[in-house]
């Protein structure tokens, strides 16, 4: 007889005040270490070790902790073996019986919803609970107050499962990651490097247009000068001999040739400018794909609306998701919404001079939430660090407006809610 699926639809845990939590999501750990995952392995392991010193603590891994869509036969075991500090910190944290480790199933690690071997590995290694949603019930003098944790992909039609326990249920987003993107990357190579890390997946067309504009058209346009220079040289040498033979003075001949060649030069340049303008218009009009591609194109707006609905019609005081990779803490009427961000590379659009098409640059993001519950208030801090990866061409760097490139590890925002 098959073992019962240990993944709960909604895991509920009750805690007293004086409880501390760390919440993170979308770190996408795989079998191969990246610069972003190395950052995660180092920094989050430190935070978990610090949390282990508290009397009663909870680590909420709020979905897409593991990258089980991409890579060659990806597994939780391979990902954790490649990130030993992270693995060790969770093992040490789990040794305190008062501590809890909770894995909320996301879409990229959706296999945790049905894969028995990977479920059991997490349960046995970390004594972890696995669920599709986690509800934290806080006992207060005014009664129970609850906070709901979900990954958030159910609000994104392209990445939502109809039955998350069915191994044959594969959303459209999984097809893109496993089939479409690899084919595009293989065919185009370096031209579209970073497309799989787009911060705004629905900007796919604009990203490709930008790369073609800067890395193909503009970067090679200097080659058009060669025939112009050759033409000018030939016309000057041959033309001078013709005018001299006809009896014109050298001064007059030189003046006529210069005026003629300047006119020819600017005529050619005019044609080139006209062609460039037409190409620019075509590229700049590359349409953003429909907003339902990616996290509905609206970042956390749907999650914020759900948070307000939960607060209005239930006993919830807060709702926390991930999925969009957009960290956020927002005060709502009688409660809050928060997004735990990510720990990955994100390729983001940047403004340019002369209203040229936007360029794209890679940045390594790391975000997490720290929650402190005391007798009267619920405190939540958003920690973040951002490091820019210099992966632009010289031309892109010259035409990109300067902006804040990096951010040291710091508390980005704080919020308190009365219990």
Where do the language-model regions lie?
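Extended recognition/assembly regions associated with phosphoester-bond processing machinery
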Residues: 1-419
């Amino acid at each position: 007889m098959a073992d019962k699926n240990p993944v709960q639809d909604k895991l509920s845990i009750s805690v007293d005040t004086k409880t501390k939590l760390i919440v993170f999501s979308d770190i996408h750990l795989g079998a191969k270490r990246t610069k972003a995952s190395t950052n995660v392995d180092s920094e989050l392991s430190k935070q978990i070790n610090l949390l282990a010193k508290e009397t009663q603590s909870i680590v909420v891994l709020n979905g897409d902790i593991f990258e089980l869509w991409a890579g060659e036969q990806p597994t939780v075991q391979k990902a954790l073996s490649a990130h030993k500090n992270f693995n060790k910190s969770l093992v040490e944290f789990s040794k305190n019986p008062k501590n809890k480790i909770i894995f909320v199933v996301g879409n990229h690690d959706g296999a945790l919803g049905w894969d028995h071997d990977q479920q059991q590995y997490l349960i046995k290694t970390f004594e972890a609970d696995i669920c599709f949603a986690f509800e934290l019930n806080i006992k207060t003098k005014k009664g129970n107050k609850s906070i709901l944790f979900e990954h958030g992909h159910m609000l994104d039609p392209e990445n939502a499962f109809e039955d998350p326990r069915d191994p044959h249920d594969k959303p459209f987003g999984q097809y893109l990651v496993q089939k479409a993107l690899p084919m595009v990357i293989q065919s185009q190579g370096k031209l579209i490097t970073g497309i799989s890390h787009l911060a705004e997946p629905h900007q796919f067309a604009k990203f490709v247009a930008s790369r073609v504009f800067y890395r193909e058209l503009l970067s090679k346009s200097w080659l058009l000068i060669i025939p112009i220079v050759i033409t000018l040289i030939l016309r000057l040498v041959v033309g001078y001999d013709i005018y001299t033979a006809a009896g014109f003075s050298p001064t007059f001949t030189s003046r006529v040739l210069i005026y003629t060649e300047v006119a020819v030069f600017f005529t050619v340049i005019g044609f080139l400018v006209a062609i460039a303008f037409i190409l620019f218009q075509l590229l700049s009009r590359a349409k953003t794909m429909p907003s339902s591609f990616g996290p509905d194109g609206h970042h956390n707006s749907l999650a914020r609306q759900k948070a307000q609905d939960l607060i209005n019609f239930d006993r919830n005081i807060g709702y926390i998701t991930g999925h969009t990779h957009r960290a956020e803490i927002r005060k709502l009427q009688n409660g809050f919404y928060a997004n735990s961000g990510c720990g990955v590379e994100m390729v983001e659009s940047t403004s340019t001079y002369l209203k040229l098409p936007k360029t794209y640059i890679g940045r390594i993001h790391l975000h997490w939430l720290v929650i402190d519950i005391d007798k009267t208030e619920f405190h939540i801090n958003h920690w973040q660090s951002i490091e820019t990866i210099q992966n632009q061409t010289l031309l892109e760097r010259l035409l990109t407006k300067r902006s804040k490139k990096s951010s040291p590890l710091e508390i980005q925002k704080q919020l308190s809610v009365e219990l």
